[in-house]
Amino acid sequence: MSAGFVQRHLGPSPAEQAQMLQRLGCRDLEQLLQECVPAEILIDADQARDALPQECDERQALRELEQRAAANTVLRNLIGLGYYDTATPALIQRHVLENPAWYTAYTPYQAEIAQGRLEALLNFQTLISELTGLPIANASLLDEATAAAEAMTLAYGACRLKQARRFHVQADLFPQTLAVLQTRAEPLGIELVVADPAAMDFGDDSFGLLLQLPTASGACPDPTEVIARAKAADVLVIAAVDPLAQVLMPPVAQLGVQIAVGSAQRFGVPLGFGGPHAAFFATTEAYKRQIPGRLVGMSRDAAGEPALRLALQTREQHIRRDKATSNICTAQVLLAVMAGFYAVHHGPDGLTAIARRVQRLTAALAAGLQQLGLDVAAAPAFDTLRLRLDQPNGWIERLEAAGFNLLPLPDGAGISLDECSDEAEVQALLECFAAGCGRTAPAISELLAATPQAKSVGELPVRPAGWLPQAVFQLYRSETELLRYIQRLVSKDFSLVHGMIPLGSCTMKLNAAAELQPVSWAAFNRLHPFVPAAQRQGYDQLINELEAWLATITGFAAVSLQPNAGSQGEYAGLLVIRAWHRQRGEGHRNICLIPTSAHGTNPASAVMAGMQVVAVQCDEAGNIDQADLAAKAEQHADQLAALMVTYPSTHGVFEQGISDICALIHRHGGQVYLDGANLNAQVGVCQPGRFGADVCHLNLHKTFCIPHGGGGPGVGPIAVAAHLAPFLPGHPLVPCGGEQAIGPVSAAPWGSASILPISWMYIRLMGGAGLRQATAVALLAANDLAERLEPHFPVLYRGANGRVAHECILDLRPLKRSAGLEVDDLAKRLMDYGFHAPTVSWPVAGTVMVEPTESESLLELDRFVEAMMAIRAEAAAIEAGLCDRDDNPLRRAPHTLAAVTADVWERPYSREQAAYPVQGLRSNKLWPAVSRIDNAFGDRNLICTCPSVEELARAAG
């Protein structure tokens, strides 16, 4: 009989685990746990085993999940409000969404082995820039509502008038967007002024304007007059735009819009009960250094060839911390890649044809409804119409019985057509309404014959032809060519398909195929987030079970799955703490203590939550300086809101006295926020809710097996103690959250709901005992690497018993003194050895942080040790004067296939040493696509869109 799932999730076999334990001098995994984890917080094995269902095999777990999926009801969703059905091309589903080469990669920090993903993201940025007419577009954000909130805060920060606190919002806006804006605005002291644009009055206290184009009700008025008034008052103009409507509309930049946001969901990304979807954010050159999220830009490599990398990173949270433009790190890369390929697949003509069909069918439907004597509120501009109806609930129920979900309104219903709408569907809608009116439905063929293609979108003219001239959107009309293009990009990218990605604090573990399989089920991915409650019963059961399991694992009382990234979890957790203080009449508490070693998102999130950051020092052992913490807590006792602490620490150790630290903060009136980035070292071993934390965010895309997707999607739920549960985030359209809920932090009630089955499957497959074993093996792998690499690279921090946690920091700073080497030299040379680098220069400059996870085999760990030892030997050759300090395999890394096969080789080391430094690479090697990239050149010469056909032709000439 084959091994069960637990053993296949774990990389080292039982025999290999025994070998590793013997090297560490431990008799078993339980002894290792006792040496790593402080006794005061370590739970026993029986408690971990009994807290959750027992492990099961894939077939059993999938059967149970199929039962939950069957409890969902999938109808044709015409609800709209920013969520629309779409036809995902089978090629994209099979070769991108379901391809581990795309979904198991990490954020492209090591750009030389991420050129494929970066090119796909450049396609997405180019698409958005072409749609909006704005020159700078980022590589995705989390959802449309949070993108709008990011635009608001950018406008607020960019305003030169300190008294300006009024942000004007069009009343006909998606309600979830307005709610997220309200959540974001209140802690920052921003006043939202919601009104019809014609009635807006801009003054010295105004800093921004947000319009929705088309509006939530389906109109598309000409906004140029209100935009002109806003700009005359030095008010920054933002538009939330529908990308499919924007295919037909003039680029909003031509209307005077300075920032455009929206969701690319309807470009081939399933509804997914609300997510994940790629939002976009485009702006002018003036705000390129304030734009939130990742930005892909062109640069050049050491050979002078074009190369892509993440641009302008100095504005991001991992560098600027509390001064960052945003707390966003994880975004929605996999979904942005899908949307970009959707545009490549259809090209500009195909996209235009889809948009025209949707607009024409909507106009024909409106005409047919009017012929039936129904009151269509106004002529639809694009895809949405509103009906005024007597007894609207009866009509909603009638249409639901016929298989259609409409948008319920107090005086009627809304209907939004989409790419999947066709003549038969519109005819069926007309038949249903006609039956309710006691009349005969008009024929859709006759309605279409009387409905010419519109020459406008509402009050705006149609975009002229000639957009999307870039070659990538022109060349791949056949499936054969597009398949080959996708595979060419895959061949340039390093993912878990190729080898270990030992990034510290990132937990690049197995994403099992059985866990991901349900993501493609229609019962999960075709539900609209605002369907009637009776249609989502399967999701309700899954969500309730997953929340209960996560609460049990963490020792907390309640969980919210709404935050759709770890950064959003941090923000939500701090808002919950803030709400609790305010409810107690202590709203003045606004000091957030944060160790200097914390993730950059921590201080950025605290500032977003209206808190003031006070740094706490770390001692020489890498632990929180408890004397400094006590002094700061005492100094700020009257204003102390929270301590943000990562556990195990960002230095890769289980600190002693974590319970005492929590108790200290509580004595001074504060709450403890525990950053769950390192929860993979705690599951089944200790419970933050039991050792003193009040709130914790979890990264389901780390600890609970949702893949990283090359930089998203992620899910960052928060778990809270009982006294904070009433404040869990709510939603304006779907009841959820606590009795005194804070506002939503994401557009959808349960965030990126369609990937929650992945974590459900992981927990169900592993069971309580399996999860504890996974944690123990993660600690085993990290300690094994630490012991084996210590003779070559000093391990910077260890715990009280000489053990590390699930990761370790290797100190490379001595090599700078002895051999003139930088940490980047090792990172780039590791590419030549077939590895992605560990985390570089964080949390300590000049070091690497290694996290092997429980899923890597001993064979892969051996290969990594071999590579690191060989690199150390190369450094030793420099130290001994045997290699030139400036011209050696480390300083010239990585080495491309083009470089080592060039006719001329003038380097003082051999081609073989460059390309095949260890023998195993001869049979299996991913070549870096480009040589080392000049990041500074790219930032000085920012190019973040694809070249057009004409530009390519000029370059070739």
Swiss-Prot record:
- Give the species this sequence originates from: Synechococcus sp. (strain RCC307)
Q: Which cofactor does it need?
A: pyridoxal 5'-phosphate
Q: Which SUPFAM superfamilies match?
A: PLP-dependent transferases
The record's comment on protein family reads: Belongs to the GcvP family.
Q: Which UniProt keywords apply?
A: Oxidoreductase, Pyridoxal phosphate
Please give the residue positions where the record annotates the modification N6-(pyridoxal phosphate)lysine. Answer: 702
Q: Name one GO biological process term.
A: glycine decarboxylation via glycine cleavage system
Alphabetized PANTHER family for the sequence = GLYCINE DEHYDROGENASE (DECARBOXYLATING), MITOCHONDRIAL, GLYCINE DEHYDROGENASE, DECARBOXYLATING
Top-level EC class: oxidoreductase
Q: Which reaction equations make up its catalytic activity?
A: N(6)-[(R)-lipoyl]-L-lysyl-[glycine-cleavage complex H protein] + glycine + H(+) = N(6)-[(R)-S(8)-aminomethyldihydrolipoyl]-L-lysyl-[glycine-cleavage complex H protein] + CO2
HAMAP family referenced in this protein's UniProt entry, alphabetically: GcvP (MF_00711)
Q: Could you state a single Gene Ontology molecular function term?
A: glycine binding
Q: What is its EC number?
A: 1.4.4.2
Function recorded in the entry? The glycine cleavage system catalyzes the degradation of glycine. The P protein binds the alpha-amino group of glycine through its pyridoxal phosphate cofactor; CO(2) is released and the remaining methylamine moiety is then transferred to the lipoamide cofactor of the H protein.
Q: What is one term from the GO cellular component aspect held by the record?
A: glycine cleavage complex
Full protein name: Glycine dehydrogenase (decarboxylating)
* Quaternary data: The glycine cleavage system is composed of four proteins: P, T, L and H.
Q: Which residues belong to the signal peptide in this entry?
A: none
